[in-house]
Amino acid sequence: MKLLVLMTLIAIATIAYLKMSKAAPLLVSSDVAPNFNLPDANGKIHQLSDYAGQWLVLYFYPKDDTPGCTKEACHFRDDLAILEKLGAKVVGVSVDDGQSHGAFAKKYSLPFPLLSDIDGLTANKYGALTNLGLVKIAKRYTFLIDPQSRIAKTYFSVDTSRHSLEIIDDLTELKAK
Protein backbone atom coordinates (compact mmCIF):
# COMPACT_ATOMS: atom_id res chain seq x y z
CA MET A 1 0.00 0.00 0.00
CA LYS A 2 2.80 2.43 0.93
CA LEU A 3 4.54 1.63 -2.33
CA LEU A 4 1.36 2.39 -4.29
CA VAL A 5 0.97 5.77 -2.56
CA LEU A 6 4.63 6.59 -3.17
CA MET A 7 4.38 5.64 -6.85
CA THR A 8 1.23 7.76 -7.24
CA LEU A 9 2.94 10.79 -5.67
CA ILE A 10 5.97 10.36 -7.91
CA ALA A 11 3.71 10.15 -10.98
CA ILE A 12 1.83 13.31 -9.97
CA ALA A 13 5.08 15.18 -9.31
CA THR A 14 6.49 14.08 -12.67
CA ILE A 15 3.38 15.21 -14.55
CA ALA A 16 3.41 18.58 -12.76
CA TYR A 17 7.11 19.03 -13.55
CA LEU A 18 6.61 18.20 -17.22
CA LYS A 19 3.72 20.65 -17.49
CA MET A 20 5.80 23.40 -15.86
CA SER A 21 8.75 22.70 -18.14
CA LYS A 22 6.69 23.43 -21.29
CA ALA A 23 6.80 27.19 -20.69
CA ALA A 24 7.90 29.26 -23.64
CA PRO A 25 11.38 30.78 -23.50
CA LEU A 26 11.57 34.32 -22.16
CA LEU A 27 11.14 36.98 -24.79
CA VAL A 28 13.86 39.55 -25.29
CA SER A 29 14.11 42.95 -26.93
CA SER A 30 13.54 42.91 -30.70
CA ASP A 31 11.53 39.65 -30.60
CA VAL A 32 8.20 39.82 -32.38
CA ALA A 33 5.49 39.97 -29.73
CA PRO A 34 3.25 36.89 -29.74
CA ASN A 35 -0.29 37.52 -30.87
CA PHE A 36 -3.13 37.23 -28.38
CA ASN A 37 -6.87 36.93 -28.72
CA LEU A 38 -8.41 37.54 -25.29
CA PRO A 39 -11.69 38.91 -23.90
CA ASP A 40 -11.96 41.84 -21.54
CA ALA A 41 -14.49 42.10 -18.70
CA ASN A 42 -17.24 43.02 -21.18
CA GLY A 43 -16.48 40.14 -23.55
CA LYS A 44 -14.81 42.34 -26.18
CA ILE A 45 -11.95 40.48 -27.85
CA HIS A 46 -8.55 42.20 -27.93
CA GLN A 47 -5.73 41.21 -30.26
CA LEU A 48 -2.16 42.44 -30.56
CA SER A 49 -3.03 43.85 -33.99
CA ASP A 50 -5.56 46.19 -32.32
CA TYR A 51 -2.55 48.07 -30.92
CA ALA A 52 -0.39 48.12 -34.07
CA GLY A 53 1.09 51.55 -34.73
CA GLN A 54 1.21 52.50 -31.05
CA TRP A 55 3.18 51.57 -27.98
CA LEU A 56 1.66 48.91 -25.73
CA VAL A 57 2.35 48.22 -22.07
CA LEU A 58 1.25 44.59 -21.75
CA TYR A 59 1.47 43.62 -18.13
CA PHE A 60 0.78 40.19 -16.67
CA TYR A 61 -0.19 39.93 -13.03
CA PRO A 62 -1.07 37.06 -10.67
CA LYS A 63 -4.52 37.83 -9.25
CA ASP A 64 -7.21 40.51 -9.19
CA ASP A 65 -7.70 42.47 -5.97
CA THR A 66 -4.58 41.24 -4.17
CA PRO A 67 -2.21 43.76 -2.54
CA GLY A 68 0.64 43.78 -5.08
CA CYS A 69 -1.63 43.55 -8.10
CA THR A 70 -3.87 46.32 -6.79
CA LYS A 71 -0.89 48.58 -6.15
CA GLU A 72 0.49 47.96 -9.63
CA ALA A 73 -2.88 48.52 -11.35
CA CYS A 74 -3.60 51.71 -9.39
CA HIS A 75 -0.19 53.14 -10.30
CA PHE A 76 -0.89 52.42 -13.96
CA ARG A 77 -4.27 54.12 -13.51
CA ASP A 78 -2.71 57.16 -11.85
CA ASP A 79 0.01 57.47 -14.52
CA LEU A 80 -2.20 56.60 -17.50
CA ALA A 81 -2.44 60.19 -18.78
CA ILE A 82 1.37 60.41 -18.98
CA LEU A 83 1.62 57.03 -20.70
CA GLU A 84 -1.07 57.99 -23.20
CA LYS A 85 0.67 61.31 -23.88
CA LEU A 86 3.73 59.23 -24.76
CA GLY A 87 1.55 57.26 -27.19
CA ALA A 88 1.13 54.10 -25.11
CA LYS A 89 -1.87 51.98 -24.24
CA VAL A 90 -1.98 49.87 -21.08
CA VAL A 91 -3.46 46.36 -21.00
CA GLY A 92 -3.42 43.99 -18.03
CA VAL A 93 -3.63 40.19 -18.33
CA SER A 94 -4.23 37.49 -15.73
CA VAL A 95 -5.86 34.08 -15.58
CA ASP A 96 -8.87 35.54 -13.74
CA ASP A 97 -12.24 35.50 -15.48
CA GLY A 98 -14.13 38.49 -16.87
CA GLN A 99 -16.41 38.77 -13.85
CA SER A 100 -13.41 39.06 -11.53
CA HIS A 101 -11.79 41.62 -13.85
CA GLY A 102 -15.00 43.65 -13.99
CA ALA A 103 -15.31 43.80 -10.21
CA PHE A 104 -11.60 44.66 -9.82
CA ALA A 105 -11.75 47.40 -12.47
CA LYS A 106 -14.91 48.88 -10.97
CA LYS A 107 -13.63 48.80 -7.38
CA TYR A 108 -10.45 50.72 -8.30
CA SER A 109 -11.73 52.74 -11.29
CA LEU A 110 -9.29 51.11 -13.68
CA PRO A 111 -9.81 52.72 -17.11
CA PHE A 112 -7.76 50.27 -19.18
CA PRO A 113 -8.67 46.75 -20.32
CA LEU A 114 -7.99 43.72 -18.15
CA LEU A 115 -7.92 40.61 -20.32
CA SER A 116 -8.88 37.09 -19.25
CA ASP A 117 -6.34 34.42 -20.12
CA ILE A 118 -8.21 31.66 -18.30
CA ASP A 119 -6.33 28.78 -19.92
CA GLY A 120 -2.97 30.56 -19.56
CA LEU A 121 -2.04 30.08 -23.23
CA THR A 122 -1.13 33.72 -23.84
CA ALA A 123 0.82 34.03 -20.59
CA ASN A 124 2.67 30.87 -21.59
CA LYS A 125 3.55 32.31 -25.03
CA TYR A 126 5.11 35.27 -23.22
CA GLY A 127 6.92 33.01 -20.73
CA ALA A 128 4.75 34.53 -18.00
CA LEU A 129 2.91 31.48 -16.69
CA THR A 130 3.43 29.42 -13.59
CA ASN A 131 1.67 26.14 -14.34
CA LEU A 132 1.21 23.87 -11.35
CA GLY A 133 -1.10 21.49 -13.17
CA LEU A 134 -4.52 22.28 -11.76
CA VAL A 135 -3.47 25.81 -10.76
CA LYS A 136 -2.19 28.39 -13.23
CA ILE A 137 -0.94 31.81 -12.23
CA ALA A 138 0.43 34.61 -14.38
CA LYS A 139 3.86 35.85 -13.35
CA ARG A 140 4.31 39.57 -12.73
CA TYR A 141 6.02 40.31 -16.05
CA THR A 142 5.61 43.34 -18.28
CA PHE A 143 6.39 43.78 -21.95
CA LEU A 144 6.78 47.19 -23.56
CA ILE A 145 5.82 46.57 -27.18
CA ASP A 146 6.75 49.06 -29.89
CA PRO A 147 4.48 50.30 -32.71
CA GLN A 148 5.85 47.56 -35.01
CA SER A 149 4.69 44.88 -32.51
CA ARG A 150 8.22 44.05 -31.36
CA ILE A 151 9.34 43.70 -27.77
CA ALA A 152 11.15 46.94 -26.90
CA LYS A 153 11.76 46.21 -23.22
CA THR A 154 11.02 43.41 -20.77
CA TYR A 155 10.44 43.59 -17.03
CA PHE A 156 10.85 40.34 -15.14
CA SER A 157 11.52 41.84 -11.72
CA VAL A 158 8.89 44.42 -10.88
CA ASP A 159 8.59 46.83 -7.96
CA THR A 160 4.83 47.44 -7.99
CA SER A 161 5.15 50.81 -6.25
CA ARG A 162 7.27 52.35 -9.02
CA HIS A 163 6.78 50.13 -12.04
CA SER A 164 4.67 52.60 -14.01
CA LEU A 165 7.29 55.32 -13.46
CA GLU A 166 10.03 52.97 -14.68
CA ILE A 167 8.03 52.36 -17.86
CA ILE A 168 7.49 56.11 -18.34
CA ASP A 169 11.25 56.68 -18.05
CA ASP A 170 12.07 53.84 -20.45
CA LEU A 171 9.39 54.84 -22.94
CA THR A 172 10.63 58.43 -22.93
CA GLU A 173 14.17 57.20 -23.58
CA LEU A 174 13.12 54.75 -26.32
CA LYS A 175 11.07 57.38 -28.13
CA ALA A 176 14.04 59.79 -28.07
CA LYS A 177 16.18 57.30 -30.06
Predicted segments with their positions:
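N-proximal helix/coil linker or "cap" segments that precede and/or mark the start of modular domains
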Residues: 5-35
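Short active-site neighborhood of thiol/selenol oxidoreductases, capturing the structured segment around
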Residues: 49-70
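A short beta-strand-turn-helix
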Residues: 36-55
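Short loop/turn microsegments at loop-to-beta-strand junctions
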Residues: 33-34, 55, 139-141
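Structural micro-motif
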Residues: 110-112, 129-132, 136-143
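Thiol-/selenol-based redox modules, centered on thioredoxin-like
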Residues: 137-177
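Structural microenvironment flanking redox-active thiols in thiol-disulfide oxidoreductases
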Residues: 70-110, 121-122
